[in-house]
Amino acid sequence: SNTVYTGILTADETNSFLLRRDGSRVFEENHIWDGYINHWTGQNVCARLLRQKDYENGEPIVIIWPDISPANVDFMELYYNERLVKYWPSLFGHSAICVNGRIYNYSHLINENEVISIEEYFYRPALGEFAPSPSTGLFEILDDGTAYYDKFGRNFMRTIHVLRVEGINGSRMRSIFDRFLEMIHNTPVNPKKPEKWADFNLFTNSCSTLIKFGLRKYGFSKINGFLPRDVFVSAAYEILKYQNKENLSVSMYSMPQLKVPEAPYSKMS
């Protein structure tokens, strides 16, 4: 269901639900993840059902996120996600980019090259396939096919540094990043590693270098670096120089990790 409900996240010893403005309760019968209850009880939030199922009860998973009114200007946000200490491929952290509410994620894994909504990128709960394996605490696919991808909301897994730029041409920027996704999904698969993007390369074809090339193509031509943190710092430096000339509004902030038992603290790369 794509119906989005807003209300106050409410929890007591026996129950949890969304209390709506008209006094009605929603999701009272559903399992609401403890991470949401611990961080956001008493706050205004949005919620909807995901198509993925909770392994405990077979019901659709409830996703909850902060109720923040959307921007009414074209914007982009560049994200530098700190590294996950559990996984060596995460040694350098990760980059992603949001254009007008659509997050472009590029990865060495073919199925993680996608456009994803803000709430699913940052705030998916550690339930069902998004959770770490109960036996190893890591990514695991069991013999019966049950998957634990250990891929829940990024803000519960790490601290994220944000470069926000308002006043861009959103449709032009989106078309650039859409073309990169098409290119990746049209790359012939290596039959020995069908789950991997065959042309991935840390120095020339990675999450951060694709974003760097896209921003250069858009017009920020001097951004350089190839690791996520380097590209983030270079982009901030270069785009700040453009802000008066291009009538852009530029800001930087961080989203501290929302600590939950399913993820250790992230670290700077």
Language-model features: where?
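A structural motif
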Residues: A147-N190
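Phosphate-binding glycine-rich loops and adjacent basic patches that engage nucleotide phosphates
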Residues: A131-L142, E166-D178, N201, N205
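Second-shell loop/turn segments in exported
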Residues: R83-K86, R158-I168, K193-L202
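Activation targets extended, charge/polar-rich intrinsically disordered C-terminal tails
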Residues: S1-P60, R174-S175, R179-S269
